Amino acid sequence: MSNRIKKVVLAYSGGLDTSVILKWLIATYNCEVIAVTADLGQNENFHDIEEKAIVTGASKAYVVDLRNEFAKNFIFPMLRASAIYEGRYLLGTAIARPLITKLLIDIARAEEADAIAHGATGKGNDQVRFELAAAALAPDIHVIAPWREWDLISRTALTTFAEKHNIPISTSHKRYSKDQNMLHCSIEGSELENPWEEPHIESYTMTVPIEHTPDSPEYITIDFEKGDPIAINGQQMIPADIMFTLNDIAGRHGIGRIDMVESRFLGIKSRGVYETPGGTIIHIAHQDLEGITLDHMTLLTRNQLIPSYADAIYNGFWFSPEREAIQAFMDKAQERVTGTVKLKLYKGMAYPIGRKSSNSLYSSQLATFEEDTSYNHNDATGFIKLKSLRIRGYQKS
């Protein structure tokens, strides 16, 4: 295999793992390596990352701004579908992997590369996500997964390799391993490997501790068009700016923290500590607007499809017929979800306190408990009698 592979496109973060992988690929496969970094809104110094890739041995280093594409074509479709994994996780890491893989494939095609490579470990979900996406997009391109090939199985071994090959590494010890983009930040390591231990205050990046949040609530409005957020407090923005603005607003109120034990696709239980400030507000506001614009059966069908849709994303099947079919239903249902939601933000919570829509199904005349002329109470008698036919006598003693 190594004789056949001459050029590899590597998903590169600039950290210890992918820097070691870059040098390892050159040494093991005697190949050219092109480093690719996707800007998905993470707080990184991309100039330094690009420079480090070249110093470490990459023939080229790409840094590609995918922020608006990520928000518009990946985050927003997922939020339109109200996707949530195991009832809690808003899929911030999982949704980024298909876009990163697509970028790797596009550059591999342009550079006539033989393979792509990633730095996902052999225990996690990301290896599956990268490789399933690659299989769907470019089954002819080989995927190299160094963590499943090499014998560098510890942080000490990686550091020793880096020092031996003069790879620049940070001397400061990082307590946590973090993966961040414009939708969320995931935190792993240290005391978090014990599911009983509370996360340390320094583990969080995007949200303020509840103890330090404002003592007065903040009120905001979010405008939606066909299920997508388009404006905050009446100001229209592009999708990426919607995410950044809501992250700032929600983050200062400590909104969007999740601490859970989840089921990995490989069958392993793992602890997930996540921050999803802006995404949490959108998720809450969007579902609230659906309540006034969608009928019961559409909502029921949507709710039945959410677990399958979320599983598809979590397990790496973004580019799959089932995900696309469910997306088609979700997007059809969202044609009515246009309007405005008013929220009260306070001490880690986002409360919808008002909603309006030109497609509203709410009728104050029908809903009122006061006297009205549009509803005949006697009509309920026949309705109840018909609905009782199926269960009449079911519990008869």
UniProtKB/Swiss-Prot annotation:
MF (Gene Ontology): argininosuccinate synthase activity; ATP binding
The UniProt record lists the keyword ATP-binding: yes
UniProt enzyme class: ligase
Q: Mind listing the UniProt keywords for this protein, alphabetically? A: Amino-acid biosynthesis, Arginine biosynthesis, ATP-binding, Cytoplasm, Ligase, Nucleotide-binding
Say yes or no: keyword Ligase present: yes
Please list the residues that bind L-aspartate.
Answer: T121, N125, D126
Gene Ontology biological process? argininosuccinate metabolic process; L-arginine biosynthetic process; urea cycle
Subcellular location per the Swiss-Prot or TrEMBL entry: Cytoplasm
Q: Per the UniProt record, which EC number(s) apply here?
A: 6.3.4.5
Residues binding ATP, per UniProt: A11, Y12, S13, G14, G15, L16, D17, T18, S19, A38, G119
Q: Give the pathway annotation.
A: Amino-acid biosynthesis; L-arginine biosynthesis; L-arginine from L-ornithine and carbamoyl phosphate: step 2/3
Q: Name one GO cellular component term.
A: cytoplasm
According to the lineage, what is the superkingdom? Bacteria
From the UniProt record, list the coiled-coil ranges.
none
**Quaternary structure, from the entry:** Homotetramer.
Q: Which family does the record claim for this protein?
A: Belongs to the argininosuccinate synthase family. Type 1 subfamily.
Q: What protein am I looking at?
A: Argininosuccinate synthase
Species this chain originates from: Lawsonia intracellularis (strain PHE/MN1-00)
